[in-house]
Amino acid sequence: MEQKKEILLPAPLFRDPVYDCPTDPTVIWNEEEKMWYLFYTQRRAGAASIGVSWVHGTKIGVAVSRDGGKWLYRGTLEGLEIERGHNTFWAPEIIRAEGIYHMYVSYITGIPTDWDYPRQMLHYTSQNLWDWTFAGRVDLGSERVIDACVYEVGPRQYKLWYKDEDNGSKTTAAVSEDLYHWSVLGEEVTDCAQEGPNVFELGGMKWMISDYWKGLAVYRSDDFTHWIRCADILNESGRRPMDKGWGHHADVVVRGERAFLFYFCHP
């Protein structure tokens, strides 16, 4: 019987070779290339900092891997601009449905030096994860929405969770049957302010993790709607190189009965 090769993952798993600050990761299998793709906010940690300008003006970085252990930086996504100038893209979320990739990304005009600017959710589609077509703004009834998580909760039934900063930074939900038109349901997780929700299934349960700036909050559910708080994770430094401080804004990839958590920290 052929034995599968165990891969020892490096720590850190990936470092952005331009700014060395990849954040808000999302990982998806590229069906066409048979490779793992990592998309992330290419935070400009080494740039001149005027207020919070270094958090803005970010592009979406791309890295690829055949085995999930060794990652190659491939650059940034092109063709996302919807207006002139240097603008801000945060926290990509990508889902594949009926042969089409859908990306939901947080967007801010320009490079603000403070937090007091509108934030929108933009929707793009692609056949190959490189060439993206703008499908429109996602109307969520708020001008300060970021950090999308999209999951198919039933056959052609999709749910979107996101951070609504106009509503106390609570995790809010919307539903859709086609990934283009969304109906807002309202706030869904209200025990604390948080961002970067991520939903997955494992061990017969529905799970949500979110970043509440003291580690990752963990919730479980039977129906993708009513969430029970569990013990936090990544709320202290790890033992591996550069694994310092709390874990932030994570993505989860489920393979069989195992889940792999991708997160970033501030070493």
What are these regions (language model features)?
Residues 1-267:
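Carbohydrate-active catalytic/glycan-binding domains of CAZyme proteins
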